From Swiss-Prot:
Glycosylation sites recorded in the entry for this protein: N361
Organism field: Aspergillus oryzae (strain ATCC 42149 / RIB 40)
Alphabetical list of InterPro entries matching this protein: MFS (IPR011701), MFS_dom (IPR020846), MFS_trans_sf (IPR036259)
Claim: Chloroplast is one of the keywords in the record: no
Gene designation: ppsE
Entries under PROSITE patterns matching the protein: MFS
Biological role: MFS-type transporter; part of the gene cluster that mediates the biosynthesis of 2,4'-dihydroxy-3'-methoxypropiophenone.
A GO cellular component entry from the record: plasma membrane
UniProt entry keywords in alphabetical sequence: Glycoprotein, Membrane, Transmembrane, Transmembrane helix, Transport
Cited Pfam families: MFS_1
Bilayer disposition of the protein: Multi-pass membrane protein
Annotated protein name in UniProt: MFS-type transporter ppsE
Family designation: Belongs to the major facilitator superfamily. CAR1 family.
Subcellular location: Membrane
Length: 490
């Protein structure tokens, strides 16, 4: 095959890149496209009217809210559950960590299911699983049964997030995609915070099992809405055929391939896997840091807030979740706007050329400013017992908002950088992400008991700065990283 040349000339406001693919790329097929392209649709499959897009977005947000609330709604009821099921609070904390580990590795289960029956059918099956095993959790007669039901419920959550992000990335144009992801993030984060509030209210007036019966109702409604509004994939076959294709679909390495490469800047077509599977491990680790922060805040609230302010009921400590919840909601709204505006600004600077990592620049103030400062204030005001209740509430509000603003750019970046392999790219992110979440969920309470809440959140602030530096390097020098890696592969 004759050599292919892709040349983008950028001087003061643009970027000079020359990529030459020689005959060695012939084995991967004749077509190669650049992700740094004009800012039109980058592989969007759907041309739905606005009202249909709104229905798809609403359903995706509601389903994500349902699955995330299933993860956290029992936090205020942990002591009551432990007492009724004859176990310990520590055992349930470890079980919560196991749920997050299951969430991370669950994509190895859902990826072949999705390949065999299609994304829409797999999506509906995941919601049905959430529905059925929430019933099992509500009817649990001992701790073992309850933990098993919790883990199976958790297995569905990550796939619903991944499939939802993949669907929104195909439905919305790049310049509106950040806002769509922001609304979906609202569903996720409000589930993580409103869920514990609802759980605290329920367990204060009735039995903890009602939490799961409410979950059953939400999952049933989500199943009905998804059956009506979630479309099939268009433009490509959803299922695999033939023995070789079926074996390939069962290969777990497909989800790990993207983690090999240092960065995404230029992606190839579906016939050039060496270039398609270029995912930033730095970005995945950054997402892991954010989930680490998120669950340190959420898991530790009953442990540090109750003794600090002498709360004695789950109702009051559950209401404290409204502070980070408000930050999550505001951050989701602001994050989408910041992400899209940053993308538009860089498109204008390059005369219409869009690179996926541009939107990461919008989250740098969160990494290097809002999050570390807020975490230090939150941790030390609780540790030193100063500032009353107002300062921790305000500081955790801003810390939570910063987490979600940073999340928006990273999530959107992952989903749009590999348009032909979105599922694998997003899945790799969640494998790492929930590994960090499991560590924070299991370790935060013993760590606070050992070194104090002030030092714990100081460590989080330091990690935030390190993560911010990594995101800055990806946003600023991602192209050079990609060119170096690509040259070594070709």
């Amino acid at each position: 095959m004759a050599e292919n040349r892709c040349l983008i000339r950028l001087n003061r406001h643009t970027l000079a890149v020359t990529i030459i693919f020689k005959k060695q790329c012939a084995d991967y097929g004749p077509r190669l496209t650049m992700q740094g392209s004009k800012h039109g649709s980058d592989g969007a499959q759907y041309a739905f009217p606005t009202w249909r897009k709104c229905l798809i977005l609403t359903d995706a947000c509601f389903v994500v809210f349902t699955s995330s609330s299933a993860l956290c709604s029992m936090f205020p009821a942990t002591a009551q559950i432990a007492a009724e099921l004859s176990t310990t609070v520590e055992t349930l904390h470890i079980a919560n960590a196991c749920v997050q580990i299951a969430m991370g590795i669950s994509l190895f289960v859902w990826q072949p299911i999705r390949s065999f029956i299609g994304r829409r059918n797999a999506y509906l099956l995941a919601i049905l699983t959430l529905f059925c095993f929430s019933i099992g959790a509500a009817l649990a007669i001992n701790a073992s049964m309850f933990i098993a039901m919790r883990i199976i419920v958790g297995i569905t959550g990550t796939f619903l997030l991944v499939a939802g992000q993949e669907l929104l990335a195909e439905t919305f144009d790049p310049v509106a995609r950040g806002a769509a992801f922001g609304y979906m993030q609202i569903g996720n984060t409000t589930g993580l915070t409103i869920g514990p509030c609802i759980g605290g209210i329920i367990v204060s007036f009735t039995r903890w099992r009602i939490i799961y019966w409410l979950q059953v109702g939400l999952a049933g409604l989500g199943l009905i809405l998804s059956s009506l509004f979630i479309p099939n994939e268009k433009g490509k076959s959803e299922t695999v055929h033939g023995s070789i294709s079926r074996l390939a679909a069962l290969n777990p390495v497909n989800l790990l391939k993207p983690l090999v490469y240092p960065n995404i800047v230029i992606t190839g077509s579906e016939r050039c896997p060496e270039i398609q599977h270029i995912l930033t491990s730095k970005q995945d680790i950054a997402c892991g840091f954010l989930v680490f922060f998120q669950f340190i805040v959420l898991t530790s609230i009953p442990h540090i807030i109750n003794p600090r302010f002498h709360f004695t009921t789950p109702l009051v400590s559950g209401l404290f979740y409204l502070a980070p919840g408000g930050g999550f909601v505001l951050g989701s709204l602001v994050g989408g706007i910041v992400s899209d505006r940053t993308t538009k600004r860089y498109i204008a600077k390059r005369n219409g050329i869009r690179l996926p990592q541009d939107r990461l620049n919008g989250s740098l103030p969160m990494w290097l400013g809002f999050m570390p400062v807020s975490m230090v204030i939150y941790g030390w005001t609780l540790d030193l017992e100063v500032g009353g209740m107002a300062v921790p509430i305000i500081s955790v509000f801003f810390a939570a908002g910063g987490i979600v603003v940073a999340f928006n750019g990273l999530n959107t970046y992952t989903a749009e950088a590999l348009p032909e392999h979105r599922f694998a790219a997003i899945s790799g992110k969640y494998i790492i992400q929930y590994g960090f979440g499991a560590v924070s969920t299991a370790a935060v309470v013993p760590l606070i008991d050992a070194i104090g809440v002030g030092l714990v959140f100081t460590i989080c602030a330091i990690i935030s700065v390190i993560g911010g530096v990594g995101v800055f390097l990806v946003a600023k020098y991602g192209l050079q990283m990609q060119n170096h890696r690509f040259s070594s592969r070709v």
